[in-house]
Amino acid sequence: MKKTKTVLSVIAVLVVFVLAFGLITRLLTPKYATDLVEGGMIAEYYDEEKNHDVIFIGDCEVYSNFSPMEMYRQQGITAYVRGTSQQLIWQSYYILKETLKYETPKVVVYNVNAMRYDEPIKEEFHRLTIDEMRWSEEKVGIIQASMTEEETFASYVFPILRYHSRFQHLTSEDFTYLFRDKDNTFNGYLMKKEVLPVEKLPAKRPLASYEFGEKCYDYLEKMTQLCKEHGVELVLIKAPSLYPYWYEQHDAQIQDFASKHGLAYYDLTRQIETIGLDFTQDTYDAGLHLNLSGATKLSGYFGKLLVENHGLEDRRNELEIATIYDEKLRLYDEAAK
């Protein structure tokens, strides 16, 4: 009897410790609800109905520029954007791999901007992509592929090792969203209504090298093979930003890769006039990304390409889909006012 009480006491202490440790960890971990909201976008996908015809993968050039709500409104396409800030191609690969465990879209659209970056860049950006992923084989892989020399795997398993110093810098957000999350996107699209027109772009200077790195090509090959194994069409794009410059040499390399692998590739930087973009009105940061006005134009244009060239169908007459998206559009239009 005494032994049983001792065991129960030990269990009770362990339970209290685990709960307290979990609560403190949650308190100190960034909430990404009202500040640095880009860090919370990856997790919003998990609560979605997994019935999308199109999945966008990539960096800020997808979550800022492509609005699934407009693609549904204009073409009846169901799409989701799994984009994060400065998402590197090996991160895109693992996010794609995870996504294909949840659903099998008809088309995956990958923005090739990250082909420029062959090495990990900044730990802070990695966190925005990785922290809110659910634990899985893919999360382990993305951590191992992304860590800088200064990072440790343990800091991802136990975020308190990374964020313990936030104790002195807690804000009201940390308490308001301690037990709940806040959705900030519309199917992965982060709406920006501000206007900051292009006034002057930096000089277009020659680069020391235009060649994409071997590591980037390896992961693009892996993404191509992964889509093929799942019967998904991979479409490559370069979003229509004015800066950083997408050089002709960059474009030629992607054209060559797409041709060799039988993939469609759209360099939308060359379609700016056709799309109807006006960078005195359609950008919120002087030409790097599109605002709501620009995203509406681009999404309608690209949605039409997907219908005409990739066999996507109008799903607005499907009752279940219409019920879901009518409510999504109501919230989207309310936010757009």
Feature locations, PLM:
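Secreted/periplasmic serine-hydrolase-like ester/acetyl group-modifying domain
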Residues: 125-230, 316-337
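C-terminal regions of proteins
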Residues: 248-324, 331-337
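Alpha-helical scaffolding within the catalytic cores
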Residues: 38-42, 64-65, 94-98, 217-223, ...
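Acidic/histidine-rich helix-loop elements
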Residues: 79-85, 208, 212, 287
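Conserved, well-ordered alpha-helix/loop/beta-strand core segments that scaffold catalytic motifs
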Residues: 107-119, 178-274
